[in-house]
Amino acid sequence: MTSLVEVTDLTIDFSSDSSSSVRAVDGLSFTLEAGGALGLVGESGSGKSATAFALLGLHRGTGARIGGSIRVDGTDVLTAQDAELRRLRGGRAAMVFQDPLSSLDPYYAVGDQIAEVYRVHHPKASRRAARERAVEVLDRVGIPDARRRARSRPHEFSGGMRQRALIAMALACEPRLLIADEPTTALDVTVQAQILDLLHDLRAETGMGLLLVTHDLGVVAGSVDDVLVMKGGRAVERGPVADVLRSPREPYSRALVEAVPRLDAVRPARDPQEDVLLEAVDLRREFGRTTAVDGVSLTVRRGETLGVVGESGSGKTTLGRMLVGLIAPTSGDLRHSVPPRALQMVFQDPVSSLNPRRSIGESIADPLRAARELDDTAIVARVRELLDRVGLNPDWYHRYPHEFSGGQRQRVGIARALAPSPALIVCDEPVSALDVTTQAQVVGLLGEIQRDLGLSLVFVAHDLAVVRQVSDRVLVMQDGRVVESGPADRVYDAPEHPYTQALLAAVPVLDPQESAARRTARRALLPVG
């Protein structure tokens, strides 16, 4: 069988300053056969995206130093002239990037952008033929009313439709290789499932090779033949996807697999108290003519975790902000048996919620200073205690947010929420931006803190597997309303509402056979999005 991709002893170095460099990829070798599918899996900083970019020569002009050898469809990428690389890119090999908004020109219609790519590689094609090809591929990737939507601009598409449009652009010239770099990371679970199903179907129809770059092992389970696990720029393990996911040989691969949240996870037994800490009755929140939350009622008991799940636009984040008083409801009643400062929040993005010009110690101290109950010496001591409580070195008090990793910054956010000794913390997507092992660590930390301090948690997320790990009861939201609620085991094991069933059917699983079966089962449940 002919190798479509051959990478031999690849090294990639980036200059960090005038005298030093960072090695992003170190001695990597692999092949991808024509028509095959390989998953390149690793956490942030593993070198997987740098490798994918190098396959198309996208390192040129970045200051990166490349060593080794890369051949893609017979082209020596490292020695090829620019003209030869242009013929390769988009023609015989194409790439789908993580963020479609940054890849699509906001000024031009989506169909015109696809037609332009087609004409670059087919200069004799007429404008009309190129536009017809754009409509054809948009229709193929599942864009409804493709001829009309080809005239739409990117902002008029949903996130899932923009990703479909990028895939259509990549398919315009019938490439032999498609490189997909984290193509579903920013998408809701049902849209993610649709995109992965689309890639699977396109492979089957066209025979193209697929290199799928991702940090999510669940994503590769039903999408590729082989998996290459990367860590620190090196290949840790490679093998058939079923073998690597079921019986990983290397400790790092095993740690990745064990950290993946599962729908069948056994939750630690908890015995929440009967007294109600917070009660919401018929909460409604409108923004102009848009209703974000529409008549939601709930209770949170002392010591329990209430999971709130839903996709983008479901109203779950707005609900969470109302519960802690950051947003006032338009109507409805919100009652709590503790003072307002006992209701705290951990935000999704710690980068935007921490002041980059202030040390993390000072940020954690803010709610303590606002209370005016402790002197400066006591405040510093309390902050150091909190840093230690969340697993950070107390001596890091004077460090700034940019000096920490994403998981460490989220620990800082948790420490700040703990500062006023809260009774309830609303966690808004606290692990959605984290690698799977860091995600598991943060979830474990929250559970440990809850057990030790007797806290109540409202855990807001779109990841149903994570929510099951932590929740006693679950609310499922769609379009601002609660469509299903109940004990977590009942909602997950016997969902009643079609939307809940569709969400659960779309959750990635680690078993390739089960993944294939779920793909078949969900086709009748999931609309195009």
Task: Label each PLM-derived region with a short phrase.
Residues A235-G239, S247, V482-G486, A494:
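ABC ATPase "signature
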